[in-house]
């Protein structure tokens, strides 16, 4: 990991993550990681909004940009804004030698390899993983991550490729997702709900469905359902919930019950052996068990596969969705 990112870790007062699209949602997960493991205040901002709101930026702050291409114009402008205020800058990028990598004080490469499809998938996984690694190392330097916790998290990370691979293999060999696509491909609206670490997974899952299948989908914090979205729930608007067994599991069960009470259909991303939730919902998108902090990385995969199968069933171009570009280089 670039030493420039870790230097001065004890003196850091604030981290601002700037990004666009899927990278922004990865940043929301990074906020949870960084605040939990480093106890540094973290803000996540759309890069396209950051420079226009006269942000409060100081030399004791770190501007952390996330951009797959390293060429996203709004993200580069946000980096420049941070530098103009004397803040240190760092970037999580995939393309080696890209503009973001060149202009920032420090860089962490995703090392995800070329991502051919316009809709980001493995770059999201790599970004979230890098954010967790940064949080672990910053936490070590600040004394907020113990040796035991570091070993626990690093050991859990070592299991991640196998778990993700098995998840994808099971999806490819079975017909669960094709059947779901057959069931739902004519629906026009979806609601995605998650809490805590899984709220960003919900909005990312909704974005994937929008991007490649052209179906309107909204991602919401589950606790906000009663503040508006609940008015939309009926037989014509399925709800996708991200509900692994974590600290907010009981809250998610309550939200599922509220959707069902209004004749809503529920698809749940949950642990495959969770018989209790299986009895509450209409369809399961199973995920494996893992460390709580790694669950978002695994939970997003069923949503990616679901969006893919929906797009295929609807005859959409998965790799080149209409009106989208891999790298947005103009405002």
Over which residues does each language-model region extend?
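Active-site phosphate/pyrophosphate-binding segments
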Residues: 1-16, 106-238, 311-331
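Glycine-rich phosphate-binding loops that contact phosphosugars or nucleotide phosphates
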Residues: 10-159, 242-285, 306
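Short, conserved micro-motifs enriched in small and acidic residues
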Residues: 21-25, 121-128, 196, 200, ...
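Extended hydrophobic-aromatic, low-complexity segments
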Residues: 26-28, 43-44, 73-76, 176-179, ...
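A charged alpha-helical hairpin associated with nucleic-acid processing machineries
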Residues: 186, 222-225, 236, 261, ...
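A signal for specific C-terminal beta-sheet/loop modules enriched in small/flexible residues
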Residues: 214, 286-289
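Generic C-terminus detector
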Residues: 265, 280, 290-331
């Amino acid at each position: 990991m670039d030493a420039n990112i870790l230097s001065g870790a004890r003196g850091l007062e604030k981290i601002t993550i700037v990004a666009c699209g899927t990278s922004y949602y990865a940043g929301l997960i990074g906020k949870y990681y960084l605040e939990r493991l480093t106890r540094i205040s973290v803000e996540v901002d759309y890069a396209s909004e950051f420079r226009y709101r006269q942000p409060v930026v100081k030399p004791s702050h770190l501007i952390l940009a996330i951009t797959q291409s390293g060429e996203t114009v709004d993200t580069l402008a946000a980096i420049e804004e941070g530098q103009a205020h004397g803040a240190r800058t760092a970037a999580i990028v995939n393309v080696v030698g890209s503009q973001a990598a060149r202009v920032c004080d420090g860089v962490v490469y995703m090392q995800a390899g070329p991502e051919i499809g316009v809709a980001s998938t493995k770059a999201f996984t790599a970004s979230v993983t890098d954010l967790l690694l940064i949080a672990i190392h910053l936490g070590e330097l600040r004394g907020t991550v113990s040796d035991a916790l570091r070993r626990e998290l690093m050991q859990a990370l070592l299991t991640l490729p196998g778990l993700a691979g098995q998840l994808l293999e099971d999806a490819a060999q079975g017909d669960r997702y094709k059947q779901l696509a057959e069931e739902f491909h004519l629906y026009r609206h979806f609601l995605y709900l998650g809490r805590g670490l899984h709220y960003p997974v919900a909005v990312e899952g909704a974005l994937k469905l929008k991007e490649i299948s052209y179906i309107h989908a909204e991602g919401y914090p589950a606790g906000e359902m009663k503040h508006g979205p609940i008015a939309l729930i009926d037989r014509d608007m399925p709800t996708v919930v991200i509900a692994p067994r974590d600290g907010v599991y009981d809250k998610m069960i309550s939200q599922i019950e509220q959707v069902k009470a209004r004749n809503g259909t529920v698809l749940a991303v949950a642990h495959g052996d969770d018989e209790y939730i299986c009895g509450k919902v209409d369809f399961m998108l199973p995920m494996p068990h893992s460390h709580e902090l790694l669950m978002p990385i695994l939970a997003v995969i069923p949503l990616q596969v679901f969006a893919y199968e929906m797009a295929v069933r609807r005859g959409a171009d998965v790799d080149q969705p209409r009106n989208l570009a891999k790298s947005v280089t103009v405002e």
